[in-house]
Amino acid sequence: MSVPTVLEKIIARKLEEVAERSRRIGLAELEQQAAIADPVRGFAAALEQRVNAKEPAVIAEVKKASPSKGVIRDPFLPAEIAAGYEAGGAACLSVLTDIDFFQGADAYLQQARAACSLPVIRKDFMIDPYQVVEARALGADCILLIVAALDDARMHELAAVAKAHGLDVLVEVHDGDELERALRLETPLVGINNRNLHTFEVSLETTLDLLPRVPKDRLVITESGILNRADVELMEINQVYAFLVGEAFMRAEQPGVELQRLFFPDRARSRGVVADPE
């Protein structure tokens, strides 16, 4: 028997978690909570506005820990981080809510969203319609669908539930086969994860290799591995203007200032922030 990958372990735990949560709060009650949640803020629209202007559309991540790196930020203050990201020029937020592997929490999403006016994606491993409704009840504006974690039927089902609740969908891929499956969804948002979710190794070539296969009517977000100004410029030269970045910001003393330094160096210099030497 082969050893389960990190992703397989996460999905196995997520199945248990959904069962536990649905016993505590039934779907009907959750639907009622979703119906009275704050209106959605337009996640896809915020990215499209920046990308159409060829400006960096940064999805800035609020993340305490990861399976590969352990605790990344401590103390961890989601509201303070979110406000800093907005001041630094982020287009959207990504907030980890997975508890067991990323030390996330639903409350972190609520705290971050309340501290700013940016649209927020619930960054979690979505495998069941219950979680989609839960995302809207928490106030999320978008959900993540990871192709590697879903079969086609479930992926389309979750996308339909998201649409019914006014949520945007970011579909995430890592290779050509996953991209082919992802493009069957209606969503314009295609995230290319430079991190292999089975091995957690990172290569920016993943985005560059898959980019020619993405239709022009889709918006590509490059995810993971953007660590310095050279990485940003490499993507922009290849007409990729949307980025999901977490660790590079989370390790900085002031995440919002680091965002500005990486993506808006002219603005950062005018405020006395030292530019990235790379």
From Swiss-Prot:
Disulphides: none
Pathway assigned in UniProt: Amino-acid biosynthesis; L-tryptophan biosynthesis; L-tryptophan from chorismate: step 4/5
A Pfam family it matches: IGPS
Keyword flag Ribonucleoprotein: no
Record EC number: 4.1.1.48
InterPro entries on file: Aldolase_TIM, Indole-3-glycerol_P_synth, Indole-3-glycerol_P_synth_dom, Indole-3-GlycerolPSynthase_CS, RibuloseP-bd_barrel
Keyword vocabulary terms for this entry: Amino-acid biosynthesis, Aromatic amino acid biosynthesis, Decarboxylase, Lyase, Tryptophan biosynthesis
Keyword Amino-acid biosynthesis included in the entry's annotation: yes
One of the GO biological process terms: L-tryptophan biosynthetic process
Catalytic activity reported: 1-(2-carboxyphenylamino)-1-deoxy-D-ribulose 5-phosphate + H(+) = (1S,2R)-1-C-(indol-3-yl)glycerol 3-phosphate + CO2 + H2O
Primary enzyme class: lyase
One function term, GO molecular function aspect: phosphoribosylanthranilate isomerase activity
Family: Belongs to the TrpC family.
Designated name of the protein: Indole-3-glycerol phosphate synthase
Gene name linked to the record: trpC
